[in-house]
């Protein structure tokens, strides 16, 4: 399975029930094709950078998931035929560095410290602890 991120923007004219229904529909598309949704972000109603189909606002939703590449074509097809989707994007994370970034984004979305941040904090803590010991040795030698 590969790592993906998708974001779609729904028309602002949809009522809350319709928005929830569309979100659930796309989640089911991923899971029915053996995909695993790691996390999702409901970004809500936002201003668009530019007018799209006579709309100045849109409802943004982001999902981070793992899936087989063959499923992506179906997901994109379903985005395209749905008139309520103003825009969408699917991003594939391929390289080791990209996959690490994907994990960091998922951790941040889940409000967990990222793997890279933990490594940095451990290194920083060890460095500051080493510096404190060196400083205390210097003060004893005077």
Curated annotation (Swiss-Prot):
This is Small ribosomal subunit protein bS6. Gene3D superfamilies: 3.30.70.60. Disulfide bonds: none annotated. Pfam families: Ribosomal_S6 (PF01250). One of its GO terms (biological process) is translation. The gene is rpsF. Keywords: Ribonucleoprotein, Ribosomal protein, RNA-binding, rRNA-binding. InterPro entries: Ribosomal_bS6 (IPR000529), Ribosomal_bS6_CS (IPR020815), Ribosomal_bS6_sf (IPR035980), Ribosomal_S6_plastid/chlpt (IPR020814), Transl_elong_EF1B/ribsomal_bS6 (IPR014717). Belongs to the bacterial ribosomal protein bS6 family. It comes from the Bacteria. One of its GO terms (cellular component) is cytosolic small ribosomal subunit. It comes from Helicobacter acinonychis (strain Sheeba). The keyword Ubl conjugation does not apply. Binds together with bS18 to 16S ribosomal RNA.
């Amino acid at each position: 399975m590969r790592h993906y991120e998708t974001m779609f923007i729904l028309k602002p004219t949809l009522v809350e029930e319709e928005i929830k229904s569309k979100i659930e529909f796309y989640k089911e598309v991923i899971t029915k094709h053996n995909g695993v949704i790691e996390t999702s972000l409901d970004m809500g109603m936002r201003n668009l950078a530019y007018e799209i189909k006579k709309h100045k606002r849109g409802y943004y939703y982001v999902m981070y998931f793992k899936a087989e590449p063959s499923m992506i074509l179906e997901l994109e097809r379903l985005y395209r035929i749905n008139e309520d989707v103003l825009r969408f994007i699917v991003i594939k994370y391929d390289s080791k560095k990209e996959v690490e970034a994907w994990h960091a984004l998922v951790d941040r979305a889940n409000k967990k410290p990222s793997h890279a941040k933990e490594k940095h904090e451990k290194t920083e803590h060890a460095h500051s602890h080493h510096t404190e010991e060196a400083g205390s040795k210097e003060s004893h030698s005077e």
